[in-house]
Amino acid sequence: LALRIRGLNEETAFRRYYPAGDVASHVLGFTGDRDAGQEGIELAQQGWLAGVPGSRRGIINRRGEAVEDVASIRAPQEGRDLALSLDSRLQYLAFRELKAAVEANRAKAGGLVILDARSGEILALANWPTYNPNSRDRAARDRMRNRALTDVFEPGSTLKPFSIAAALDAGTVRPDTPIATGGGTLTIGSATIHDAHPAGTLTVEQVIQKSSNVGAAKIALGLPAQTLWKTLADVGFGTPPKTGFPGEVSGRLRPAKSWKPIEQATMSYGHGISVNL
C-alpha cells in the first residue's frame, strides 16, 4: 500500500462475534462476506438487520485519493435492533440436557424446542451436533443444519390428544365413554395394532392416561376421515410453522380421501403422519 500501486486498496471489514457460541448457533446463524446473513435469524431477518449504505459525490485524483467531498447523494441507514423471545437460561439448559441425552442414548443427533404454551413463543431451540459460529471454518456443513426445523419424524403417541379431541368435538365420545381394548390388540385387514400392556375396558380419559393405541384407533375409526383430517389441519399439521427460518419443512398430512382404515387407525397414535419439532 505504501507503494501506491494502482488497483491495490485497503478495505476495513467487520465480523460478528456470538457470545453464546455453539449454544444458540442454530437460532442466530451467522453472517458471511460483507455482513450478509448466511444461516438462522441472520439470514431470515437480513432485510431488518442490515443497514443500507449511503453514497457521496466527490473528486479523486489519479491515485484514487479523495481530494474533494462535493455532496451527499444518499444518507446511510443503520441496521435495526431485533429482540428474540429466547430465554437465555432455558436455552443453556436445553442445550446441556439435549447434549447429555444424545450422548447417553448413543444417538446420531437430536433436537429440542421449548415453547410458551400461551403465546406460542419459542423460549429455547437447540440441536446436537452443533457448531461454533465464531470458528465455523472447522465445522462440517451437516452440523449447521437446524434439525428441529428441517428434519421430520412420526410424532407417535403425542398425537393421541389431537385425535381424541376431534372425537370429543364431534360428539362421538365423552371423557367417560367406555372403550373396549380387549387383550390389547386390534386387527384391521392383515395388520394388527398392539398396546404395550393389555388394559381391558378404558374410558376415553384413560385411553390418554394409559396411552392405548387400540383405544385411540377405535375412537378415530368412529369418525369420518375428513373430520379427523380437519382437526389435524386446523392445529397446523401438514403446514410449515412459518418461523421464517431458512429450510423449515411442513411435515406431511395426506388428504383424507386417500386414507385406508388402517391408515386412519394408525394416524390416531401418530404413525403415517410426519412433523418437525
Region locations from a protein language model:
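A mature extracytoplasmic/lumenal domain signature
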Residues: 12-14, 31, 86-90, 98, ...
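Short, small/polar residue-rich loop motifs at catalytic or cofactor-binding pockets
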Residues: 53, 106-109, 180
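Small/polar-residue-rich segments within soluble enzyme cores
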Residues: 1-79
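Flexible, solvent-exposed loop/hinge segments and secondary-structure transition points
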Residues: 5, 35, 90, 98-119, ...
